């Protein structure tokens, strides 16, 4: 139940942020997602990595009760956002070998659990880097053109909602391997600059409505609290949360500038503050 509440919060923040910027009555033909495990619906299933969830007990609350590769007991935010936008109840993983051409029309997720903006993150985890996800996106658009024509591809590029969600694995894991090159602030800045570069590249490929998630309070995940939070208190790992906040502080104004510079809509989606408040004051959000 706790995870479902958090998932729902992410969905509402993402959709409402988009609606405020774009308007509530805009028709969205598809949802296209890039990122990590929060949005992965099974892209890791056939990769040579330990980071996969296509086995029990994962999926026990998913329709049919079977594991699909989602890093969850049930659906994940990419599914819920797609449903909230009136598209599909479950967003397909692009790497699913059984996808048919018509399955591509309402959108897909390229997200790969364990990845990040730092290319080293995907290399360490043997998963799909966000940069390789862009290569698969180009392949996706080529398939749309081949099966449904140039006009449909143009419609998807210009009017779909493109969502980018990453940084947690970089901050929580890869920084330790990069500490000889960066201090905490400069690494967070490097990640934010990489995120902005990713958005630029996505825009070059034709995407015009792009939302980018902030970093989450990754210092509050159970592993960080257990290892670094104190034996009795199990508090959040504050230095790690400070890195996440530094990432956000650099990313938000950079995306605002990019939104003014480029045609289309580019939005920063702040999920950090709401999630941190839920963690610190759970009773405000009901019993769960």
Swiss-Prot record:
It is found in: Secreted. Keywords: Glycoprotein, Hydrolase, Lipid degradation, Lipid metabolism, Secreted, Signal. The active site is at 37 (nucleophile). One of its GO terms (cellular component) is extracellular region. Its EC number is 3.1.1.-. It is an enzyme of class 3 (hydrolase). Pfam families: Lipase_GDSL (PF00657). It comes from the Eukaryota. GO terms for molecular function: lipase activity. One of its GO terms (biological process) is lipid catabolic process. Glycans are attached at residue 25. Its main location: secreted. Residues 1-19 form the signal peptide. Belongs to the 'GDSL' lipolytic enzyme family. This is GDSL esterase/lipase At3g43550. It comes from Arabidopsis thaliana.
